[in-house]
Design a protein with these regions (language model features):
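Short, glycine/charged-enriched secondary-structure capping and boundary segments
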Residues: 156-158, 181-182, 221-224, 280-282, ...
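Generic hydrophobic alpha-helical scaffold/packing signal
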Residues: 131, 195, 253, 379, ...
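Active-site-adjacent substrate/metal-binding segments within catalytic domains
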Residues: 44-45, 69-175, 183-206, 345-383
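Residues that line or immediately flank small-molecule/substrate-binding pockets and catalytic motifs
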Residues: 82, 112-114, 146, 211, ...
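Active-site neighborhood of glycoside hydrolase catalytic domains
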Residues: 161, 177-275, 423-424
Length: 627
């Protein structure tokens, strides 16, 4: 217990929690000091991240008493857990994963930026909407990006409650910083204040020195980095690097080690390790440390590169889309609804972002019939890109043990990498992420030429003994083939449970009008389902689908069943009310209905609860392209 006393003082320190009380006599001197008190809980309830267990929180209260009267008191709500960043030599290089209460955790989530450009406008409700959305999307980690802010207490309290681990950057990003004594003293005070403020939150998993500065400067590789070094003489380079090391290799780790000795510190994201040689800096594909992979998007590489360029922990990667039309119309009039209008370019912070979205759309998806349709198609494109990445990362477990895409939220209404727009409306990618981050996931991999592999990825601590049921359909819903296979997966592991050549699977069926459906069943229920197509989406032969929607009897207008007469791709439901559907932006096969529930934002005093969506608009690719 840390105590600051104005002068000498003697009395009793009392600590209480969960009905237990511990006391000791203390004598304090003037100034700041730490007093230790042994306290033990028999059979404590541990704090777990979402998906591994409950998020039990204890309230510890400390009091200073003199003659039975309270002189000072403070309480903290915290969870009991052990967490460490495991970096150990293995068959591939050096591991990089988090171990919570002795259990290896595959980190699934996104990067968090400030929720508003004007942070005073952010409310607890907005924080809860984001963090509840992360939990509902099967995430277990958010990375607080070093180019933003040290977040409000409410953010961390909610991460504690929802079981979302926090990778916490110190607030340094994409720039070099001074190393003079006055600046370092200022940084030390800021770091100490924030480490003390946040160290009792069980959600804090890691302290990271900065965002991308190590890789941007790449001190030990002359031709690497972002080109900064060429602007400086050798002498000035050494001075700048010495300043960098003083801040990120000395000051910040010392603060963390002194004030939060059980916490881990990582100097910069991304990097391989603190080796002080050329092996320190991260690349596109490394066997140690973490990676920010931007070949897809910034360098216009194809989605398929996600399966090749990965490492031990993917802490940043992403792809842009536009928000839905309702959000775009909050900043653009009808005359400005064009890809390269001044308003659209002003609401795009990447120098060629809108053109890049269009370029990728031409590579992978059919041509939208107008700009409003392009908005929806761009969201499908983003979702497909992130599905490619997330599932590639998860299939490579335990080599890869983390996937955090850029980014979860937006600070203003804009075309961006976010999975929720400024108003908190889920884009298609949020539903894609929810499906691709399920604790038990079916992943169908068609990236090998002429082959299809079906993987089961499990993040649960128990083995799975189930059955894979798969079927081949044409787009009219005709069953072409059915087969099954045993699906056994060890606890917290992955397995390929079925493989086939494409030719052997199709047996002459038209690849442009055929879909594979795979379901994993165990203990009498379906754990996950996935669809797979045999040609890119732009090449499949779609017909005009008639999608019907009906209310589920007895649901009080909160649940709905959808059916179609021919394959409907990317069925998107838009509700009048603010909220989310249990599933959305999915494909419908004739004869296989899908039932969804609407969860209203803030309904029944909760972040999400069943509610009426009001008017529902149903769209699909058939509405966005010319057929």
């Amino acid at each position: 217990v840390e105590v600051e006393a104005e002068g000498a003082w003697s009395g009793t320190l009392r600590l209480s929690a969960d009905g237990r009380v511990w006391e000791r006599e203390v004598s304090l001197a003037a100034g700041l000091q730490t007093v230790e008190l042994d306290a033990g809980l028999e059979q404590p309830r541990l704090w777990w991240s979402r998906g591994l267990g409950g998020q039990h929180l204890y309230t510890f209260r400390a009091e200073l008493l003199a003659s039975g009267r309270q002189a000072a008191a403070r309480q903290a709500r915290t969870g009991l857990r052990s967490i460490r960043l495991v970096r150990e030599k293995d068959e591939w290089g050096t591991s990089f994963y988090f171990e919570l209460n002795g259990v290896p955790v595959f980190a699934k989530g996104a990067n968090h930026i400030p929720l508003d450009s004007f942070v005073t406008r952010v409310t607890r409700e907005r924080y809860e909407h984001e963090i509840a959305s992360a939990a509902l999307s099967n995430m277990n980690m958010l990375r607080v990006w070093g180019g933003g802010i040290y977040e409000d207490d409410a953010f961390y309290e909610l991460c504690d409650e929802y079981g979302i681990l926090v990778w916490q950057d110190f607030m340094f990003a994409c720039s070099l910083y001074p190393g003079d004594e006055a600046f370092l003293a200022n940084v030390r005070a800021e770091a100490e204040q924030n480490v003390k403020r946040l160290r009792n939150h069980p959600s804090i998993a890691l302290w990271c020195g900065n965002n991308e500065i190590d890789t941007a400067w790449s001190h030990y590789l002359e031709d690497a980095g972002w080109g900064w070094k060429k602007n400086y003489s050798p002498e000035l380079r050494e001075k700048l690097w010495a300043d960098y090391e003083a801040l990120f290799h000395e000051l910040l780790p010392e603060v963390v080690g002194r004030l939060a000795p059980e916490a881990d510190y990582w100097p910069s994201s991304p990097m391989q390790a603190l080796t002080r040689d050329a092996n320190q800096h991260a690349g596109k594909r490394t066997s140690s440390g973490d990676i920010h992979y931007w070949g897809v998007w910034h360098e216009a590489e194809p989605f398929e590169r996600y399966t090749l360029n990965l490492g031990r922990f993917m802490s940043e990667y992403g792809f842009q889309s536009f928000p839905e039309a309702r959000t775009v119309r909050s900043y653009a009039g009808e005359r400005e609804m064009e890809l390269l209008s001044d308003v659209m370019l002003s609401h795009q912070r990447h120098p060629s972002g809108n053109k890049l979205i269009k370029r990728y759309q031409s590579m992978y998806l059919p041509e939208p019939k107008d700009f409003v349709s392009f908005l929806s198609v761009s969201q499908v494109l983003q979702g497909e890109a992130m599905k490619y990445a997330i599932e590639a990362h998860r299939r490579r477990k335990p080599f890869c043990m983390g996937t955090l895409y850029w980014q979860m939220d937006d600070c203003w209404p804009v075309a961006s990498w976010a999975s929720m727009d400024y108003f908190g409306r889920w884009k298609a990618i949020q539903y894609y992420a929810k499906r691709s981050m399920k604790d038990v996931m079916v992943s169908i991999d068609g990236t090998k030429e002429g082959e299809v592999d079906i993987h089961i990825v499990s993040d649960v601590p128990e083995p799975i003994d189930g059955t894979l049921h798969a079927a081949l359909y044409d787009f009219d819903g005709k069953l072409l083939k059915r087969f099954s296979a045993q699906a056994k997966v060890e606890a917290n592991a992955t397995a390929v449970v079925w493989s086939s050549s494409v030719d052997g699977l199709l047996e002459g069926a038209d690849p442009k009008r055929t879909v594979l459906k795979a379901d994993l069943a165990a203990d009498g229920r379906v754990l996950d389902s996935k669809l797979h197509y045999f040609v890119p989406a732009k090449d499949i032969k779609l017909s005009k689908a008639m999608v019907t929607i009906r209310e589920v009897a007895g649901s009080n207008g909160t649940a709905f069943t959808l059916e179609t007469d021919t394959l409907a791709k990317q069925v998107a439901l838009f509700a009048e009310a603010e909220g989310v559907f249990s599933d959305n932006w999915f494909d419908l096969i004739p004869g296989i209905p899908v039932t969804v529930e609407f969860l209203g934002r803030g309904a029944a005093g909760r972040a999400f609860a069943p509610a009426s969506p009001g008017r529902i608009t149903v769209q699909s690719f058939a509405d966005w392209i010319e057929l």
